[in-house]
Design a protein with these regions (language model features):
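Nucleotide-sugar donor-binding/catalytic module of glycosyltransferases
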Residues: 1-151
């Protein structure tokens, strides 16, 4: 409720009574959403100061997917410095995956699987685009069902 009062985001939190597995958990999270965008945020991750305000500005551009970088922290919340582990080479940039040249350039800039949407808490997706994908149930159990939908 604190976030709802400060930002124009309909933030929802749900914890299932039993473990339904990662893939069904991701799918359930987006299905319960009612806003234009979904940020499936892991329970062991934290938002940095001003991240909601920053994303509120970025979402105004209307892109389908936003991939945020992350900070790695130890158990005492001290930043771990691993500059080689950024998702992508280069700064912020808009890529159109419907453009083959952009897609190839995007993949060539990926430093790790994080750039391929593996780290869920770094992904914000337009909910209607996610919902438009006909999901292949054979991806349940991979822990990467969301990557099928995003790519």
């Amino acid at each position: 409720n604190i976030w709802r009062d400060r930002f124009n985001f309909p933030i929802l939190y749900q914890r299932h009574n039993e473990n339904i597995g990662p893939d069904r958990n991701y799918l359930s999270a987006v299905n319960m959403g009612t806003g234009d965008y979904c940020w499936i945020f892991g329970s062991d991750d934290i938002l940095t100061k001003n991240s909601l305000a920053l994303m509120e500005d970025k979402l105004a551009a209307g892109s389908d997917i936003y991939l945020c970088d992350r900070r790695e922290l130890d158990i005492s919340m001290t930043k771990i410095s691993n500059p080689h582990r950024r998702w992508l080479n280069g700064g912020s940039r808009l890529f159109s995956f419907s453009n083959e040249a952009d897609l190839i350039e995007y993949f060539s800039k990926c430093n790790s699987v994080g750039g391929l949407f593996s780290y869920l808490s770094s992904i914000i997706v337009k909910r209607n685009k996610w919902s438009d994908v006909i999901f292949d149930e054979s991806y349940i159990g991979t822990a990467y069902a969301h990557v099928y939908i995003l790519l």
